[in-house]
Amino acid sequence: MAEKYVIAIDEGTTSARAIVFDKELNILGIGQNEFTQYYPQPGYVEHSPEEIWQAQLLAINKALEKAKIDRNNILSIGITNQRETTVMWDTRTGKPIYNAIVWQDRRTAPITDYLKANYLRLIKDRTGLVPDPYFSASKIKWILDNIPNAREKAEKGEIKFGTIDTYLIWKLTNGKAHVTDYSNASRTMLFNIRKLEWDREILEILNIPEAILPDVKPSSEIYGYAEILNSSIPISGDAGDQQAALFGQIAFNQGDVKCTYGTGSFILLNTGSNLVSSNDLLTTIAWGVGKGITYALEGSIFITGAAVQWFRDGLRAIDVSDEIEPLAGSVPDNGGVYFVPAFTGLGAPYWDPYARGLIIGITRGTTKAHIARAILESMAYQTMDVLGIMQRDSGIKIDALKVDGGASKNDLLMQFQADILKMKVVRPKIMETTSMGVAMLAGLSVGYWNSMDELKQKWKIDQVFEPKMDDEYREKLYSGWKEAVRRALGWAKTIGG
């Protein structure tokens, strides 16, 4: 019998990707296509859904060409996606009624300010989220209120809403399936994560018709069949990108935690079947497999890798990002310099939009190497901030941090991360954890892999970083960071700008 394969569709914020995996989780082929970012007004960020669709089809074809396999041997498809980004389309024509409003878009702040002032506790208790333009709910309301005939069509059932996974499943199945999974639904700010259903009271508050919303299903089951590649292939896995990365890190047990270092960083802690509430972090659904639901705590750090980009492009201190590691390693320590990357405020656990970036502790002896080191160290300090709150609010002791994303390749940073956390930092062999996670979910539901235990055997470690720093020095460094953050907080409110 011919060997079968799983293809992961990974629709991100800047590009559409596809990766072909075999049963041993080897990567056979990768396809990637970037698409346009639209900024029609300050605070607005949009994508063209049709451009995403075309980019995704090209990525699938590229991945299959590179894999050099018979297309008839694709057993199933998994879809992972940028979360919260909102698409609405006409069910008759299949065409979007407006561009996709991206998770970064801030135009709906007046809506969410109203919700925060009047319904904060209700929304937090039911959805696990804090009212913010980040999530889908206010984006849906904006489209219904501002696009001609949108509300009228929605009331008649002529319009559908979806996060990007839902839109792609609709397109792949030629309009036969209008579905999402628990993890994506939990990022809309409309889904009751306790009852596992759309929350009618929140829908009424926002005047959103329930008829436009997709069916919500577990993250590993057959949602429909993709009519592409001249065959009918089951779409059998679906998860938001950060939840897929948690699954791809084999973080199946309560207390398992991962940090993805990208432009910003996302930290997710598996809290098992326990729905843990936190004032400083988001409560979300990690995944649903079978009849069980796994919950997670999430901390979002706004600026990590973007600080390296600023050091490269803004200060022109380095030519390419990879140069920061040897530069930072050329000095034995930070020389008393701290860098707080509050370019757009601070996320978890501070949630201060008025904080601003700060470099402090500069002396005549400070060099760009000290600043480079302070930038890398800021990523580790912010991770420590979030993990501290996670342990406090969940009551779960965290023993190790699993890492992925671009900056996790930086050995100096990973060693400092282990030192400052006083815990092991574990880096996997395959860094494509998001795509791998949804490939696993897709393969499980069609029997490609028989169990999560089987998947554990296939996951391989690249390196484990053990903590080496003494306690007194660790505490001194971290107290310096906390003092630097204190000085950055509220800056824009104090002096304006």
UniProtKB/Swiss-Prot annotation:
<comment type="pathway">
    <text>Polyol metabolism; glycerol degradation via glycerol kinase pathway; sn-glycerol 3-phosphate from glycerol: step 1/1.</text>
</comment>
<comment type="function">
    <text>Key enzyme in the regulation of glycerol uptake and metabolism. Catalyzes the phosphorylation of glycerol to yield sn-glycerol 3-phosphate.</text>
</comment>
<feature type="binding site">
    <location>
        <position position="17"/>
    </location>
    <ligand>
        <name>ADP</name>
    </ligand>
</feature>
<feature type="binding site">
    <location>
        <position position="406"/>
    </location>
    <ligand>
        <name>ATP</name>
    </ligand>
</feature>
<feature type="binding site">
    <location>
        <position position="305"/>
    </location>
    <ligand>
        <name>ADP</name>
    </ligand>
</feature>
<dbReference type="InterPro" id="IPR000577">
    <property type="entry name" value="Carb_kinase_FGGY"/>
</dbReference>
<keyword id="KW-0067">ATP-binding</keyword>
<dbReference type="GO" id="GO:0006072">
    <property type="term" value="P:glycerol-3-phosphate metabolic process"/>
</dbReference>
<feature type="binding site">
    <location>
        <position position="14"/>
    </location>
    <ligand>
        <name>ATP</name>
    </ligand>
</feature>
<dbReference type="InterPro" id="IPR043129">
    <property type="entry name" value="ATPase_NBD"/>
</dbReference>
<dbReference type="InterPro" id="IPR005999">
    <property type="entry name" value="Glycerol_kin"/>
</dbReference>
<feature type="binding site">
    <location>
        <position position="263"/>
    </location>
    <ligand>
        <name>ADP</name>
    </ligand>
</feature>
<feature type="binding site">
    <location>
        <position position="84"/>
    </location>
    <ligand>
        <name>glycerol</name>
    </ligand>
</feature>
<feature type="binding site">
    <location>
        <position position="84"/>
    </location>
    <ligand>
        <name>sn-glycerol 3-phosphate</name>
    </ligand>
</feature>
<dbReference type="GO" id="GO:0006071">
    <property type="term" value="P:glycerol metabolic process"/>
</dbReference>
<dbReference type="InterPro" id="IPR018483">
    <property type="entry name" value="Carb_kinase_FGGY_CS"/>
</dbReference>
<feature type="binding site">
    <location>
        <position position="410"/>
    </location>
    <ligand>
        <name>ADP</name>
    </ligand>
</feature>
<feature type="binding site">
    <location>
        <position position="242"/>
    </location>
    <ligand>
        <name>glycerol</name>
    </ligand>
</feature>
<dbReference type="Pfam" id="PF00370">
    <property type="entry name" value="FGGY_N"/>
</dbReference>
<feature type="binding site">
    <location>
        <position position="83"/>
    </location>
    <ligand>
        <name>glycerol</name>
    </ligand>
</feature>
<dbReference type="InterPro" id="IPR018485">
    <property type="entry name" value="FGGY_C"/>
</dbReference>
<keyword id="KW-0547">Nucleotide-binding</keyword>
<feature type="binding site">
    <location>
        <position position="309"/>
    </location>
    <ligand>
        <name>ATP</name>
    </ligand>
</feature>
<feature type="binding site">
    <location>
        <position position="134"/>
    </location>
    <ligand>
        <name>sn-glycerol 3-phosphate</name>
    </ligand>
</feature>
<feature type="binding site">
    <location>
        <position position="13"/>
    </location>
    <ligand>
        <name>ATP</name>
    </ligand>
</feature>
<feature type="binding site">
    <location>
        <position position="263"/>
    </location>
    <ligand>
        <name>ATP</name>
    </ligand>
</feature>
<feature type="binding site">
    <location>
        <position position="241"/>
    </location>
    <ligand>
        <name>glycerol</name>
    </ligand>
</feature>
<feature type="binding site">
    <location>
        <position position="83"/>
    </location>
    <ligand>
        <name>sn-glycerol 3-phosphate</name>
    </ligand>
</feature>
<feature type="binding site">
    <location>
        <position position="305"/>
    </location>
    <ligand>
        <name>ATP</name>
    </ligand>
</feature>
<dbReference type="InterPro" id="IPR018484">
    <property type="entry name" value="FGGY_N"/>
</dbReference>
<keyword id="KW-0418">Kinase</keyword>
<protein>
    <recommendedName>
        <fullName>Glycerol kinase 2</fullName>
        <ecNumber>2.7.1.30</ecNumber>
    </recommendedName>
</protein>
<keyword id="KW-0808">Transferase</keyword>
<dbReference type="GO" id="GO:0005524">
    <property type="term" value="F:ATP binding"/>
</dbReference>
<feature type="binding site">
    <location>
        <position position="13"/>
    </location>
    <ligand>
        <name>sn-glycerol 3-phosphate</name>
    </ligand>
</feature>
<feature type="binding site">
    <location>
        <position position="15"/>
    </location>
    <ligand>
        <name>ATP</name>
    </ligand>
</feature>
<dbReference type="GO" id="GO:0004370">
    <property type="term" value="F:glycerol kinase activity"/>
</dbReference>
<feature type="binding site">
    <location>
        <position position="406"/>
    </location>
    <ligand>
        <name>ADP</name>
    </ligand>
</feature>
<comment type="similarity">
    <text>Belongs to the FGGY kinase family.</text>
</comment>
<feature type="binding site">
    <location>
        <position position="13"/>
    </location>
    <ligand>
        <name>ADP</name>
    </ligand>
</feature>
<dbReference type="Pfam" id="PF02782">
    <property type="entry name" value="FGGY_C"/>
</dbReference>
<dbReference type="GO" id="GO:0019563">
    <property type="term" value="P:glycerol catabolic process"/>
</dbReference>
